[in-house]
Structure formats: structure tokens, C-alpha cells
């Protein structure tokens, strides 16, 4: 189900949190439907930043739909590394779209474990793992019957009956978008563009 259609104003993920300079990251897992329906490519997001400013490299759709898709659909032992996703405002007016709560056990904070809260309409843009995400979408479309396997793929024993937990690393920059601490300055946004290019 898409995040925009869910009842609560937020969706929560259990995550491990860390910092790398001005970047805070949250390591978590998403079920496959959440990943393919809610993580977007930069060119799918409406906004003031151009595609060339936001994306790392041009997608090779053929590679994603053949080589990587066959890796997923032909079974056996397989694993994907994390997809790296930056959390950004979905519009110039949106200033708050994420927060986190520390996890406690017996009244004590469990170091680095948090509950990540993502608010509706946050832009979740893949910055590393674009080809993996594209192949996961193709797999999901075959799994749900939206885009059936071809006769040749069936002959080659492709199967899309299994679902996966997708490892994801969410990135946020400083307090941009954090509830109660949102900084919507253009300077921070410009730094984000530069950081996601590297």
C-alpha cells in the first residue's frame, strides 16, 4: 500500500541510527511492496530541482530488466545490498517530514536503536541502487500479475512468486525536514544536491 493512502499521518520503521558528519542515517528494512511503491527515482518527483541536479547517473533500463531481473527471478541464493535513499521535501512548501524516537527497554535507552517516523508526502529518492530498484519493480509487477512474465522467461524458469525484505539506508542532512527543527534554507538544499552527486 502506498504511503500517501495510509490512514496515519506517519509510517514507522524500527531502525539503527548513526551519524557521518552532517548526515544522519537510518538502516532498516522495507517489505517489497513498500519499497517499489514509495521509493522514487529523482525524475518522478515534482519540484524545483532539475533531474540532472538530483540523479547520480542515467539508468540502464536494459541492464535492470535483463541482467538484474534474471538474478532475482531465476531463484537460488541471492542477496541485494542496501538501497540508499535520501529523504527530501516533496514540495517547496513542505518543511517537516521526518523524526525519530529513541527506543527504551526497562527505562533505559538502547543505544542506536530508534523508531523512524516518516510523514506523508515525503520524497524518498533513491541515490544508490537505482538499477536494483528498477529490477525490483519489474519483479513486483510480475509477482502481482501487472506485467506477466514472457513465454521466453517462463521457458527459462523465471519465477516471481517469492517476496523479499529490502535493506534500505535512509539519509537526512542536518535537521532538514525534522519535525520541530526543520531548516528549509536554500543553502542546505544546495549542499544536498552536491552531496548526492558523490
Predicted segments with their positions:
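Basic- and aromatic-enriched surface patches that contact anionic nucleotides/nucleic acids
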Residues: 79, 89, 98-198
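N-terminal extension/subdomain marker
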Residues: 1-123
Amino acid at each position: 500500500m502506498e504511503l500517501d493512502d495510509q490512514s496515519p499521518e506517519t509510517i514507522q520503521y524500527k531502525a539503527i541510527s548513526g551519524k557521518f558528519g552532517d548526515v544522519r542515517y537510518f538502516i532498516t528494512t522495507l517489505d517489497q511492496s513498500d519499497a517499489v511503491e514509495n521509493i522514487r527515482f529523482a525524475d518522478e518527483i515534482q519540484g524545483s530541482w532539475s533531474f540532472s541536479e538530483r540523479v547520480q547517473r542515467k539508468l540502464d533500463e536494459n541492464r535492470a530488466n535483463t541482467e538484474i531481473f534474471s538474478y532475482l527471478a531465476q531463484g537460488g541464493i541471492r542477496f541485494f545490498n542496501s538501497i540508499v535513499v535520501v529523504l527530501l521535501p516533496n514540495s517547496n512548501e513542505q518543511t517537516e517530514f521526518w523524526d525519530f524516537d529513541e527506543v527504551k527497554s526497562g527505562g533505559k535507552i538502547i543505544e542506536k536503536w530508534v523508531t523512524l517516523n516518516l510523514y506523508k508526502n515525503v520524497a524518498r529518492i533513491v541515490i544508490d541502487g537505482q538499477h536494483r530498484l528498477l529490477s525490483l519493480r519489474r519483479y513486483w509487477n510480475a509477482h502481482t500479475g501487472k506485467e506477466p512474465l514472457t513465454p521466453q522467461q517462463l521457458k527459462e524458469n523465471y519465477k516471481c512468486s517469492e517476496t523479499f525484505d529490502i535493506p534500505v539506508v535512509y539519509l537526512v542532512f542536518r535537521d532538514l525536514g525534522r519535525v520541530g527543527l526543520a531548516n528549509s534554507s536554500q543553502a542546505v538544499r544546495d549542499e544536498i544536491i552536491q552531496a548526492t552527486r558523490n
